[in-house]
Amino acid sequence: MEKIKVKIKGKEYEVEKGTPLGKIFELAGIKDALGGVINGKIIDLQTPVRESGEIKPVYRGSKESLEIMRHSLAHIMAQALKELYGAKKVHLGVGPTTEEGFYYDVEVEGHKITEEDLPKIEQKMKEIIERDYPILRRELSREEAIKLFDKLKEKYKIDIIKEIPEEEVISVYEQGDFIDLCKGPHLPSTGKAGAFKLTSISGAYWKGRSDQPQLTRIYGIAYWSDKEVKERLKFYEEVKKRDHRRLGKELEFFTIDDNVGAGLILWLPRGAIYRKVLEDYLREEHLKRGYQLVYTPHVGKSKLWETSGHLECYKQNMFPSMKIDEEEYYVKPMNCPFHIAIYKSRTRSYKELPLKLFELGTVYRYELSGVLHGLLRVRGFTQDDAHIVCTPEQVNDVIRETLDFALSTLKDFGFNEFKIYLSTRPEYSIGSDEQWEVSQNALKKAIEDLGYEYEIDEGGGAFYGPKIDVKIRDAIGRMWQLSTIQFDFNLPERFDMTYVGPDNKKHRPYMIHRALLGSIERFTGILLEHYAGLLPIWLSPTQVMIIPIADRHHEYAKKVYEFLKENGIRAEMDLREERMNAKIRDAELKKIPVILVVGDREAQNNTVSVRTKKEGNLGSMELNKFLDWIKEKIKNKE
């Protein structure tokens, strides 16, 4: 029998290949472990160990133990569903873990599961935990597995089995009379599960494809203690309140129409005003920093995408081709090849570099319908996309200026807490050692020169170049990846990009892809959730709502409105026959940042009574003074 060597807590053991982890732990005197980590992979006590390496025991309370426990809770939920609605009537899809819990995609014959069913499902899960079933692992041949799940009427499991590579082990886990196809890891028994709560239900297409059946996805969260679960539920309530999909509808920012297509955003008038302000800001800031604005088509010939490598490496994310004049065209998934075509439209001299091209470029990418999510995951979106072409000598200055631009932009939107990640050369890469050294050093130096800390993602760069990613922390503590600064050693070669140097010879330039916000759509979703819909004054579609106390104050309200409008302030009037307090409440619900109340005293003194959601009642201000006040707020990006 073949032997392997494993190291546990500094001591080496020689065991037979395929010995279950639990047996190895017995040999090593390890007690109370729920599983282990070997060569970066979490496995449970029943999993055969087939490779040498160091094993780190996993105990209750650790991050890895949550992965094991949450996986078992997904199975416990599936078993509960079968007990409640009939084993042969519940067909199981997939049931993975998530960052905070688990979900299972299921199809239930004759019953539509709703959120009202969740307490009943939870109760049944608690019963299964109380029974403390041992969780047992078995390995099957492909034929045995198909036969088993055919008998269990589990058509989706058979689908999965057929797609498992020939060389991969097929395993099932059993608890009581429940059995499921699964790689693991799992707890030793159901009784070892921690605290959990089922949180929501959604629809999910099988395999994420709209041409497949729609299943019911049931989500749960799980931690080791009730206290942690309660804290997360409180957090989820806050997340729900801030959901950009709800806010987008309430604030009339955007909509999605089935007849137009999933993942394709329709910007409504209020959202369009906000978007214009955002895009105007971006254009102005880019022009200030020496970028040149460009516009490019939404489609390009297949030859372009062949040269760029997209058809070879990215076709699954592209929309199907269309034929025009006997030639194939594709809608663009990226702007880069078009910007390169602009660069190559004439011979470039080193004196023109760095050349910085900027476009608010709309791109289209095929995403599975199951992953689409409001503005955060779409099929058509507009990137704040720039490409910088420079000489090797200019790289340090260019990267420092670009990172500074990214961070100052994010600060303008109210984000002040960043995490910066530097991703370095992977095992497989293109480009010379010199290119990688120059670019990685430039990225590192830029971060250090600007005084920021960073984490190195060793080997995490793309095969064509290293990059910086900037993540921001939002108002409720979530991290979002926004800015990217990415070197590319691939496209300059593919497109034969050159510049004429001082020696009058052609040289290959460095090229940098750069996005500050990522995309207008996703950034808007993040911004709406960060501010819970109450955007800063400078970004709000309506900055001021004017509310007259009575009908006789309408004329003065109109005068204030015209004055503000003439001075570039986006204002509205509420002239409805409603009580003043009702109008104020409506303005607050519409997330209008500044409310002006006008009555007899204001009309006589040419003043306005000012209140804001953030600062409360600011009292009376002379009209010109108010204009100065709000312009200062706008100037300071408040």
UniProtKB/Swiss-Prot annotation:
Protein origin, superkingdom: Bacteria
Gene name of this polypeptide: thrS
Assembly behavior: Homodimer.
Native source organism of the sequence: Aquifex aeolicus (strain VF5)
SUPFAM superfamilies in the record: Class II aaRS ABD-related, Class II aaRS and biotin synthetases, ThrRS/AlaRS common domain
Signal peptide range: none
Record-stated family: Belongs to the class-II aminoacyl-tRNA synthetase family.
Keywords: Aminoacyl-tRNA synthetase, ATP-binding, Cytoplasm, Ligase, Metal-binding, Nucleotide-binding, Protein biosynthesis, RNA-binding, tRNA-binding, Zinc
Protein name: Threonine--tRNA ligase
Catalytic reaction list: tRNA(Thr) + L-threonine + ATP = L-threonyl-tRNA(Thr) + AMP + diphosphate + H(+)
Enzyme class: ligase
GO BP: threonyl-tRNA aminoacylation
Classification via InterPro entries: aa-tRNA-synt_IIb, aa-tRNA-synth_II, aa-tRNA-synth_II/BPL/LPL, Anticodon-bd, Anticodon-bd_dom_sf, TGS, Thr-tRNA-ligase_IIa, Thr/Ala-tRNA-synth_IIc_edit
